[in-house]
Amino acid sequence: MVSPQQILDEIRRGTEEVLLEEELKLRLEQGRILRVKAGFDPTAPELHLGHTVLLNKLRQFQEFGHEVLFLIGDFTGMIGDPSGKNVTRQPLTRDKILENARTYEEQIFRVLDPEKTLVVFNSSWMSGMTAADLVRLSSHYTVARMLERDDFYKRYQGKRPIAIHEFLYPLLQGYDSVALKADVELGGTDQKFNLLVGRDLQKAYGQEQQIIITMPILEGLDGVQKMSKSLGNYIGISEPPREIFGKLMSISDDLMWRYLELLSSRPMSEISRWKKEVEQGANPRDIKVKLAKEIVARFHDDSMAEQVHEAFVAQFRRGAMPEDIPEILIVAGREGIAIARLLKESALTASTSESLRLIKQGAVKIDGQRLGNQSLQILPGITHVVQVGKRRFARVSIRLSEDQCRK
């Protein structure tokens, strides 16, 4: 039988902070089923590996017998979380929120156990809140407390606007914990303020305060900025297995250790042993293969993980071109499109500056020919096979815009 201390040690793995750890240990010792909450605003349709840092920790709680409250912030999502933002965020429409929420429900059970997961929508209690309820909720916090939050403080000091609804967001997120009577809440490090608001509100409403666990923000494929679809440095959990495998094989050796800690279910003792082996001369590529196969198997199956590994070996050791090259259509004027912009719009690079750097390094080929001209314009009407590095390919077609066609 696993002891409360052993459970705590496992839960602590990969976390940034556990507030308060002694309280969590006490609740584990009580042996009751904990209600473990994590909220996701469905502001984008696809979950990526960055989201699974939280999902994996939720799954860990489930494996120890606890219940997960997967909160879809369909109400708060229409406000938009201001955390880390230096400008007011544009709210999403209700229809877009619901469309994204449906895809979340389809994707989360690739990680979570559906038998131990309660999916809830915060519109269930927030849509019925009256003006009096909102005023009562707002009375539990002050503007001074809100300005303690770093992003609000910087905007205030810089005389940049802060909308009233942005002050409401942490209160509404915190009230979710009251409505759900959460014992534990998980969130990214950028969510710490909001999670603490939840603790404060639970106390104000006469409830036992939740334990807070913050998780690191996962770096994207570039190893610098956080994983984000908008930055193009992400791995979506619904992507084809070959794409997931190839992207993981492309990460740096340093980033590989970070991904192993936050994404892998391998014991830390095993990962530590691998580190020592690499220090003694073992090839880190072999460990990267293990990581890539594990992640593909998680979102597909073991057989598919073996298949994409074999395909990867064939492609990059024998110089084979992948069979399923993505087809990209770009609309441009008669002057065409600059090659650096084409690479970015085809999602082959994260930015035009990265495009220019890779061209300079000789890492870009068009129709098999290495490109050296950074200012090349690609004209409409022709389809090209574009390659960046060893494993990124796209079949790109440039089409004239309708306005240009009429001229």
Swiss-Prot record:
Q: Which domain of life is it from?
A: Bacteria
Query: Where, by residue number, does the polypeptide cross the bilayer?
Result: none
- Name the GO cellular-component terms: cytosol
Q: Which EC number(s) does the record attach to this protein?
A: 6.1.1.1
Where is the protein localized? Cytoplasm
The short motif 'HIGH' region is annotated over 42-51
A single Pfam family it belongs to is tRNA-synt_1b
Q: Which reaction does it catalyse?
A: tRNA(Tyr) + L-tyrosine + ATP = L-tyrosyl-tRNA(Tyr) + AMP + diphosphate + H(+)
The alphabetized list of GO BP terms reads: tyrosyl-tRNA aminoacylation
Q: What is its main location?
A: cytoplasm
Q: Which parts of the sequence belong to the S4 RNA-binding domain?
A: 337-398
Q: Where is this motif: 'KMSKS' region?
A: 226-230
Q: Which UniProt keywords apply?
A: Aminoacyl-tRNA synthetase, ATP-binding, Cytoplasm, Ligase, Nucleotide-binding, Protein biosynthesis, RNA-binding
Residues binding ATP are K229
Q: Which family does it belong to?
A: Belongs to the class-I aminoacyl-tRNA synthetase family. TyrS type 2 subfamily.
Description of how the protein assembles with itself and partners: Homodimer.
The record, for HAMAP family, names: Tyr_tRNA_synth_type2
**What name does UniProt use for this protein?**
Tyrosine--tRNA ligase
Starting at the broadest rank, the lineage of the source organism is: Bacteria, Pseudomonadati, Pseudomonadota, Gammaproteobacteria, Chromatiales
